């Protein structure tokens, strides 16, 4: 059992100005990470960020801490999280650091690390960094202090990497695509990738100002994208979240296409092309419709705990190459080491171009079960609502009523004081009623 104090399921995250997302904490974090990670010869760390205004402050703090530990910082500027993972590998850096709170509002921020091979740090390394933070900061000799520099061609490098995951013999020239970059880190990457592959691109959510990241745009709110797809009579829409590790799509009729459907399309295309290795990994939240659709194709399916790090662990355990969360994290280990929204989107576009099929038609082989997800906020430190007898009783009643034609899942958020209530079944009205019954029970605790 991990006893990490600061690191959550996706690094360290919180409201800017409140512990732990403060300049002094982040400076010490940089120093502690530098002490732990300085094990090889390069002594350099890649630092990327999304478009939050607080990114400037936090990257300066990290730089100071790393320099004190004798490590040099290479800044990418605003860059998608998977791009930092990629650049960490190609530069042979000790590690990569991303300053982002992903899909959260601008006033939150976070720090997450990538190892030298572009994967998330093991728990043991995070625990070692936390242990180092209990010590007093000590500065290396002046001659050994770290330096700072910028990778001026970081964006171009990642654009070329993304394009290389799309087959040379295909083109997007017949497609009109609306792309929504959430006013986040993909704003200068995704539109260029799609244009250079031949698409007619209409870009929205590409004017970051430091405070508008994820604000009524992006993968967590596709209403603007849906409206624009319909208004432009586009073939599809593609939305990323603030740091570009998630992708959600919209078909030409304005229907939202979730991560489960995206993985289904990619897995089925892999099967058709003969390069699917093993099965596909989802999570406890993955729709039953995905499991049934993959089963009909003869593709094995396994569920991991919620969180892309757990999806990756399950993929590695089974030796499989495809995994996803319904929220839009899609991991394709034959192409990337982490969730990469642009790359995942390109694989769906590959299936469209190769088969001359619309996104709507590609989704038609999978029937999504009605699923309700309700987030219920509780007071941190007031006890665990999931352990309350009244909540357990109502949950048991609902599970009995659904039988084997539905599912109930209650879990705590890894980053916020929220209980996530998920109910899934064949009848939408029944699912909604059951979700509200459980939600009311949690609120009453």
UniProtKB/Swiss-Prot annotation:
PROSITE patterns, alphabetized: PGM_PMM
Modified residues (Phosphoserine): 102
GO biological process, alphabetically ordered: carbohydrate metabolic process; peptidoglycan biosynthetic process; UDP-N-acetylglucosamine biosynthetic process
Enzyme Commission designation: 5.4.2.10
Catalytic site: 102 (phosphoserine intermediate)
Cofactor: Mg(2+)
Enzyme class: isomerase
Cofactor descriptive note: Binds 1 Mg(2+) ion per subunit.
SUPFAM superfamilies in the record: Phosphoglucomutase, C-terminal domain, Phosphoglucomutase, first 3 domains
Pfam families, per database record: PGM_PMM_I, PGM_PMM_II, PGM_PMM_III, PGM_PMM_IV
GO cellular component terms attached to this protein's record: cytosol
Keywords: Isomerase, Magnesium, Metal-binding, Phosphoprotein
Domain of life: Bacteria
Record PTM text: Activated by phosphorylation.
UniProt-listed InterPro entries: A-D-PHexomutase_a/b/a-I, A-D-PHexomutase_a/b/a-I/II/III, A-D-PHexomutase_a/b/a-II, A-D-PHexomutase_a/b/a-III, A-D-PHexomutase_C, A-D-PHexomutase_C_sf, A-D-PHexomutase_CS, Alpha-D-phosphohexomutase_SF
Residue numbers binding Mg(2+): 102, 241, 243, 245
GO terms of molecular function: magnesium ion binding; phosphoglucosamine mutase activity; phosphomannomutase activity
Reaction it catalyzes: alpha-D-glucosamine 1-phosphate = D-glucosamine 6-phosphate
Function: Catalyzes the conversion of glucosamine-6-phosphate to glucosamine-1-phosphate.
NCBIfam families: glmM, PRK10887.1
Entry's family note: Belongs to the phosphohexose mutase family.
Protein name (database record): Phosphoglucosamine mutase
Gene coding for it: glmM
